Regions:
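Conserved beta-strand signature within the Rossmann-like core of class I S-adenosyl-L-methionine
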Residues: 147-159
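Class I SAM-dependent methyltransferase SAM/SAH-binding core
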Residues: 73-120
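Conserved Class I S-adenosyl-L-methionine
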Residues: 196-282
Length: 282
């Protein structure tokens, strides 16, 4: 049990201030240009396991409208629209929105999805995109926008950019994220009653040769891990196997490579949902 003093300290702590200090110490946040460069890798031509789990937890009512803030290329917006929900899909990356437009046209969802070029400074909703400098500000905007239910997802172990199994195997250091703890406590201080559910989404990285695999995975070797490149090459050489689905579209629509690693990369997410507490909503 938590005694009275500890409980009072938890409730009075400046969780958002501490969050902002942590963000200031992190590497530079990715801007729209960085996400523009990644857009070519996002081609959501099928509903990924993450999207299916997210939609199940979101538990929307039939035809309920959704604001998807940080929509990217539409990994959530497209399946939501296919399920009959009107979606306002907002992102600050023009290239991501261009990829979303292609998906909208491909599936004939022009009457279901409304793309908007917006950043967190404009309006708020989030699936995997709530990690901003001012977390309380983002959560407050989301709370004020939603009429019935708010939901965010945040990483509950290592960043999706990293393969935790591989990094541990080669002795590379990695910092696991606990941002969802800050979000939960900030929401409590806002007067909300957040519910947290954890789920995992699998990821399978594929490549066409050993050197291509090393080049791909070496992006994970940063923040002092650059000297682990030889260990990385040895690990991939020992654990690369034939990909039985080589050439087929992957979860992002890009053709899969000839090889893959002999383990599935898993990302753990914290799904946080709550009823809006802001007053003055219609």
């Amino acid at each position: 049990m938590v005694d009275g003093d500890a409980r009072a300290e938890l409730l009075s702590a400046d969780w958002n201030g501490e969050w902002m200090r942590l963000q200031a110490a992190r590497r530079r946040a990715d801007d729209s240009f960085e996400w523009d460069k990644r857009a070519r890798h996002f081609r959501p031509l099928e509903t990924a396991p993450y999207a299916r789990d997210f939609m199940k937890l979101l538990a929307l009512k039939p035809s309920e409208s959704v604001l998807d803030m940080g929509c990217g290329a539409g990994s959530i917006a497209i399946p939501l629209a296919q399920a009959g929900h009107p979606v306002i899909a907002a992102d600050f990356s023009p290239s991501m929105l261009g990829t979303l437009d292609a998906g909208i046209e491909y599936y004939g969802l022009e009457d279901r999805i409304t793309p908007l070029e917006l950043a967190w400074d404009d309006v708020a909703f989030a699936s995997r995109s709530v990690t901003t400098t001012n977390l309380k500000g983002a959560l407050t905007k989301l709370d004020r926008t939603a009429r019935r239910r708010c939901a965010v997802t945040m990483v509950a172990n290592s960043s999706p950019r990293y393969d935790l199994h591989l990094m541990n195997a080669i002795g590379a250091s990695i910092t696991c994220s606990n941002g969802f703890v800050y979000a939960f406590n900030i929401l409590i201080q806002m007067g909300a009653l957040p519910q947290v559910t954890y789920f995992e989404s699998p990821r399978r990285d594929t490549f066409d040769s050993l050197e291509a695999g090393v080049a791909d995975f070496s992006r994970m070797l940063e923040h002092g891990n650059e000297d682990k490149i030889d260990r990385l090459r040895d690990y991939i050489a020992q654990h690369m196997i034939e990909n039985p689905h080589a050439g087929e579209p992957g979860s992002k629509g890009v053709p899969q490579g000839r090889y893959m690693l002999d383990h599935v990369r898993k990302v753990r997410w914290a799904f946080i949902a709550w009823e809006p507490v802001s007053s003055g909503r219609p």
